[in-house]
Amino acid sequence: MAQLETRTEPMVVNFGPHHPSMHGVLRLVVTLDGENVIDCEPVIGYLHRGMEKIAENRTNVMYVPYVSRMDYAAGMFYEAIVVNAPERLANIPVPKRASYIRVLMLELNRIANHLLWLGPFLADVGAQTPFFYIFREREMIYDLWEAATGQRLINNNFFRIGGVACDLPYGWLEKCIDFCDWFGPKIDEYEKLITNNPIFRKRIEGLGTIERDQAINWSLSGPMLRASGVSWDLRKVDSYECYDDFDWQIASEKEGDCYARYRVRVEEMRQSLSIIRQACKMIPGGPTENLEAQRMATEDKKSEIFGIDYQYVAKKVAPTFKIPNGELYTRLESGKGEIGVFIQGNNEVTPWRFKIRAADLNNLQILPHILKGAKIADIMAILGSIDVIMGSVDR
């Protein structure tokens, strides 16, 4: 009796670049054997805009508004790194108050980044309701940004060499503390709804597992690295800005799967809330209205209340600021991982070389490796757990 041949030829399927779960214009060329993924080739570059070459033809003041369009979920981080590089190359001091304001903006952006990851990730695995919850919380962060910078999501244009563009408006710190008081219980609601949900856990536990050594060898960073058991956070390692002044813990897990990456990001939101609370209480000079009242009540212009640490910018940099000769790599911890800038100056107003390291580009490189052997239905869950923004990947 003749037996039927059950072996089939591999099928090549294109996911994207316009698939709703692609998180941007990413194309995956996936080779399937039935339901099993046997190969995957990411195709990137659809959103390339030449951001590095633009940087090499603009002064720093002109370039800051551009960078929030790269990672439009985390524009503040790119603003920070773009001004940090020439600051360190030129040894420009940053007032303590300005550093605290920067930390407040960065941690608010970290929460906003993780919220915008959480909603679409849960939608990818079939839970639609939390997608609407996260925008309720993000609106409050947008309101805080709008009050401080004039813009909501991108084009904040708030960071400057030597500090920030302006001081915080009256009542801003109180509104920020109100947000912390309101958002803390919301994280508990998320955990109650999601974390121990048996359907959610069965859907993503064990998916996309990355071992500790793999995470290090693939140069992963951020939650992708910390979910694999590596407690590495540049806020602790490099101690940039004023993070040493605060008491907080690095969020990490050991399992290395999609569920561990979810747990890390939720815990990071809690830690960011803690940092924001501490920064609001410890900021030099306190609220802007109190600082101005103290200055008006003090006749001695040599008082410490007029000192550099109580200013929002060390000295406003001229549009003709020249980047000194030399080269430097500087980095910081964004919501997605390590973003960095290699800058090479030649004593001109524009840099000779401006190289940007995007965290999600490095994190995306491991995708073909962890997709092999997975089911076709798990592709979107694994991709969603990485957290990529294609504007940042392609630049």
UniProtKB/Swiss-Prot annotation:
Listed InterPro entries: NADH_Q_OxRdtase_suD, NADH_UbQ_OxRdtase_49kDa_CS, NDH1_su_D/H, NiFe-Hase_large
Enzyme class: translocase
Molecular function terms, GO-annotated: NAD binding; oxidoreductase activity, acting on NAD(P)H, quinone or similar compound as acceptor; quinone binding
Transmembrane segments: none
Membrane topology reported for the UniProt record: Peripheral membrane protein
Gene3D superfamilies in alphabetical order: Cytochrome-c3 Hydrogenase, chain B
Family label: Belongs to the complex I 49 kDa subunit family.
Entry function: NDH-1 shuttles electrons from an unknown electron donor, via FMN and iron-sulfur (Fe-S) centers, to quinones in the respiratory and/or the photosynthetic chain. The immediate electron acceptor for the enzyme in this species is believed to be plastoquinone. Couples the redox reaction to proton translocation, and thus conserves the redox energy in a proton gradient. Cyanobacterial NDH-1 also plays a role in inorganic carbon-concentration.
Quaternary structure annotation from Swiss-Prot or TrEMBL: NDH-1 can be composed of about 15 different subunits; different subcomplexes with different compositions have been identified which probably have different functions.
Protein's UniProt name: NAD(P)H-quinone oxidoreductase subunit H
Organism, scientific name: Prochlorococcus marinus (strain MIT 9312)
